């Protein structure tokens, strides 16, 4: 989330100072932001199955302990 906010602020500052018609870098920053988002989504997708292996066991143990 911090990276996204930094990219948004940087894009706004540069777009205002240069003018949107000359702001080719806005597309570059947008592509970088999309790449970061896809990488994070892929990372979460890879970790989720591993997390699902361990969490049901922990939930079972806590349910058995409370009974």
From Swiss-Prot:
Residues 1-19 form the signal peptide. Induction: In response to mating. Ejaculatory duct of adult males. GO terms for biological process: defense response to Gram-positive bacterium; innate immune response; male-specific antibacterial humoral response. It is found in: Secreted. Keywords: Antibiotic, Antimicrobial, Immunity, Innate immunity, Secreted, Signal. One of its GO terms (cellular component) is extracellular region. Its main location: secreted. Belongs to the andropin family. Male-specific peptide with moderate activity against Gram-positive bacteria. This is Andropin. It comes from Drosophila orena (Fruit fly).
């Amino acid at each position: 989330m911090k990276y996204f906010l930094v990219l948004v602020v940087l894009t706004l500052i540069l777009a205002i100072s240069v003018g949107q018609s000359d702001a080719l870098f806005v597309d570059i920053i947008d592509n970088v932001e999309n790449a970061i988002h896809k990488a994070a989504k892929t990372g979460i997708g890879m970790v989720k199955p591993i997390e699902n292996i361990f969490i049901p066991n922990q939930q079972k143990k806590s349910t058995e302990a409370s009974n």
